Amino acid sequence: SLFQLGKMILQETGKNPAASYGAYGCNCGVLGRGKPKDATDRCCYVHKCCKKKLTGCDPKKDRYSYSWKDKTIVCGENNPCLKELCECDKAVAICLRENLNTYNKKYRYHLKPFCKKADPC
């Protein structure tokens, strides 16, 4: 669910997920689409592609189980789609943490109409 994704992002980056990534670049947030502006935006692009491959669950609403052990996200789910959704969310949270040094405040509220068409997933 979006709540769980936000919690993972907060745990990994220490940033408020809605304020920091809700409208970042061309791909972060609900309306995201377009050629990534930087490494952080690319994390969101890859995340959208990851979620597009899912079948049998709703990435926005369906909840999955995961735990936070030794500062590591551990997905624990028997349902294959929910396990994959958890892994997609885990990957983007880690990617955002790994690219904190390239986070650019000028892309925090980037206007989506200015985004160029992205390559298909």
Swiss-Prot record:
PANTHER family for the chain: PHOSPHOLIPASE A2 FAMILY MEMBER, PHOSPHOLIPASE A2, MEMBRANE ASSOCIATED
Subunit structure as annotated in this protein's UniProt entry: Homodimer; non-covalently linked (probable alternative/compact dimer conformation in solution).
Marked site (Cationic membrane-docking site (MDoS)) residue numbers: K112, K117
Site feature Hydrophobic membrane-disruption site (MDiS), where: L111, F114
Tissue specificity as recorded in UniProt: Expressed by the venom gland.
Keyword Secreted listed: yes
Gene Ontology CC annotation, any one: extracellular region
Native source organism of the sequence: Bothrops brazili
Source taxon at top rank: Eukaryota
Location in the cell: Secreted
GO terms of biological process kind: arachidonate secretion; defense response to bacterium; lipid catabolic process; negative regulation of T cell proliferation; phospholipid metabolic process
Keyword Repressor carried by entry: no
Pfam family, one: Phospholip_A2_1
SMART domains according to UniProt: PA2c (SM00085)
Protein name stated in the entry: Basic phospholipase A2 homolog 2
Residue span of region Important for membrane-damaging activities in eukaryotes and bacteria: 105-117
Disulfide-bond pairs as recorded: C26-C115, C28-C44, C43-C95, C49-C121, C50-C88, C57-C81, C75-C86
Site feature location: Important residue of the cationic membrane-docking site (MDoS): K105, R108
